[in-house]
Amino acid sequence: FCGLPEMIKYSVKDLPKLINTKIDLVKKDNLLNQMLEVGYIFINDKKRIVEAYHKAKAIYDYEKSKLKLPLVNKTNNVVIMGHPYVLSDDYLNMNIKAKLKKAGLNYLLPEMFDDDILTKYAKQYNGKVFWYFFHQMIGTCFYLLEQKLVEGIIYLSSFGCGIDSVVAETVERNIRRNCDIPFMLLTIDEHSGEGGFNTRLEAFIDMLKWRKQNENYISPYGNYLYTR
């Protein structure tokens, strides 16, 4: 996505003005200044732009706070990992959250956990964390491993996202190395319709239910029968 504005700019003729503002959150007041830059494209009124910014931020903070509810259950939980633009868009993710709920499972999202907690657990990663998204996903990974809050992990990836190719592989490797929690990587672009997506999701759900029903089962394979 980083190169998309330049690709469009130099490959499509007679374009209107592109909104190509760099968002840098390192400095405290940068976001407001950057939103002013965007706002001036539409209206030359600083007061209205600032009011719109604060209103939008208040709505965003409110919606985000609703996600950070305390966990009621520590069973039947599945975490869905991936970029917010995939997890929040029910068209892109093929309504996966509703499908999990219908199957009797609770879904968790990385946004439900406090940033301070994820920062603490992200430090357990031995390598260098390059992006905030990487920090969020690897922090969620280590937090879930220690707290044992979930029975399954689903990572929704977009084929065109280069960051996903690094983050998803790192998360999967750490999960498989440190625990036996089932992990499934679903690349949403691989499925032209819901058929293939649903088949993989249903198989994953069935496997979770089978594990729970048979967690105390010990196979008799290899035992001898003695008769007299």
Explain the meaning of each model-derived region:
Residues 1-228:
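An N-terminal assembly and electron-transfer interface module characteristic of large anaerobic redox
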